[in-house]
Amino acid sequence: MSSSLEDQLVSYVRHHAKDGILLDTNILLLLLVARFKPDLVGGKRLEIYGLRDAELLTAYVKNFSRILTTSHVLAETSNFARQIMKGRTQASFFAWLHPLFCIDSEDSLVQCAIQGRDIDGGLFVRLGLTDSGLAASAKDGRLLLTSDLDLHIAVASEGAPSINFTHMREAAGLL
């Protein structure tokens, strides 16, 4: 990994480990699928990723005390997961996912409330509801990890902390 990116990633951990890390839909989906059934990584909706990508993601996210998300990301992640899995696998996955998404516990994902008035109209037009909501949440100083270059650029251009997972993959020699 390039030393400047590695230094930046370490700095982000130092500054955001207690507060947590905000994940976009594709990153959250990759993380959850890799934890539940790693052999699905590389399949539908996760075609561009391999197990080493999932390992890189998991290793980095472990540095943070909690995973932050929004209700929009949870809805998209749930819908995408339904496209990936069927039958008993899907039922087992959603039974496992329910407490993470819906029950307030130490292990559950932390939802960041986004008010409609906080979403920038221009970003909404360019990025849609889910990503403009993530951008609004990141403006509060939350560290965002995304695979979406447009979202990464939008957040970083506002001076908010953002990591592009593709850059991490490139630096780790996975692309």
Task: Please place each PLM-identified region on the residue numbering.
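Short, well-structured N-terminal submotif of metal-dependent ribonuclease cores
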Residues: 1-69, 84-89, 170-174
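PIN-domain endoribonuclease scaffold, especially VapC-family toxins
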Residues: 52-127, 132-133, 173-174
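Alpha-helix capping/helix-boundary segments
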Residues: 27-28, 73, 134, 150-152
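Acidic active-site catalytic centers that drive phospho-/nucleotidyl reactions
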Residues: 24, 131, 148
